[in-house]
Amino acid sequence: MIEVHPPHERVHSWTQFFIHIAAITIGLLIAIGLEQTVVYFHHRHQLQEARRELTAELKENRGVLTKNLDAVRKMTAEVDANMALLHAAQTSPAPIGSKLVYGLGNFWWPKDATWQAVKQNGSLGLMAHDELHYYVYIYEDISIIMEQSSELGARIELARAIARRSPDGNLTPRDIEELITVTSEVQAKVAYLTLLFRLEENALQKKIEEIPKIEQKLNQN
């Protein structure tokens, strides 16, 4: 806190008064300048730290993304095989319950703890517009991935429950119809997740200034 102290000696003339006022003004300006300098370097350090931590987190997410792309490829093959079995069972009834595979595989949750932290501590307000836009674009995509993954998990659990209704694997025509519907929903979710992963992959390979161009192309399509 900046404090202004009264003069120790009595002021006897206007000249002394103005000299005293000038000294106070200069002192205040110096104090404010020093304070602003401290704040500037604090913000600069805070921004540099945020950049380092976000860079490290996105590096981890690149590894997570590679695993998740493998997982959705496997899931796509499994769900397509399930759909083929279900359609075949409609025309040629046979025990298929044990042959159906509904799983999330080796799906990994993307990381966003650092992003959530820097949103709270004010570091984002210190970034240039293009840099902020870059991180917002990527982490909004990651947020949607998390949301869609949760919804996918719920549909897969429903499909598993239906497939387990018959211990011997002989599903009723109604069970098969329900499974076809749910499996179609799972296929759509997996396809959408694959698209989101590709968008994340594309963004992680781009430079900060290229992100607006990506969004422009997506909006045109």
Regions found by a protein language model. Give the residues of each.
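Long, hydrophobic alpha-helical segments that serve as membrane-spanning/inserting helices
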Residues: 1-15, 36-221
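N-terminal signal-anchor/signal peptide hydrophobic helix marking the start
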Residues: 11-25, 29
